[in-house]
């Protein structure tokens, strides 16, 4: 079935990874996840080319599927039996949209976690919930030397520049942006207002010098060790994240080997 287009996904975490790539494999190598995307040396004409540093890690990651096994509710089953052909399609489409929203929200949650270099997500097994973990990189953390409440405009600019320089030290330059928790974003807005910085507060971000700072708009649910539901975000409280926009970040959709659809697709549904 062809379901109407979903509303735009406004997740900042998901936006960072751009359009998803389809990879017709059930595995993805760790080396591919860790591949470096920096500059390479030029060579003398006629010499051998540069061998990309894909890494020697031969281990692989097996992505786990987002699988929803739903049954029509009794009240909808009654409506389904009395509905016309078009009415039946609308009931089915409502279910499919709900499932598509669940998949989107789960993808957004994984994108949030990927910003920190680790996936640590709840996974359903026959014995209950366990953790699905993937580590593919270390993220440098810096501590702001002053309290947020006393920070000046100059203090903040100095720290943002320091954060960006951590990327350039690793050979990743070019454009970048910041995502800040609500507390940090609110304080930045207060600072630029008090400093009378003209035209610094935009519709969806704040300009701190030449840096764009966005307010974290992502949240997702997880469960703690006791099984209690907790809410998480891309940024922790009083945290700001810098992300280089040309760091080679990608989102890949892999195929599953236990469903009728044998090709990699972002979403597959059947009734």
Annotate each predicted stretch with a short phrase.
Residues 4-39, 132-135, 231-235, 242, ...:
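Basic/polar low-complexity intrinsically disordered segments
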Residues 10-79:
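Assembly/oligomerization interface modules of large self-assembling protein complexes
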Residues 35, 125, 222-224:
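Acidic surface patches and DE-rich sequence motifs
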Residues 45, 189-191, 255:
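Short conserved micro-motifs at the rims of enzyme active sites and ligand-binding pockets
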Residues 60-138, 155, 165-179:
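Long, contiguous amphipathic alpha-helices that act as assembly "spine/axial" helices in icosahedral shell
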Residues 129-202:
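Extended, solvent-exposed, turn-rich assembly/linker loops in the middle of proteins
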Residues 193-271:
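Sequence/fold signature of self-assembling virion shell proteins
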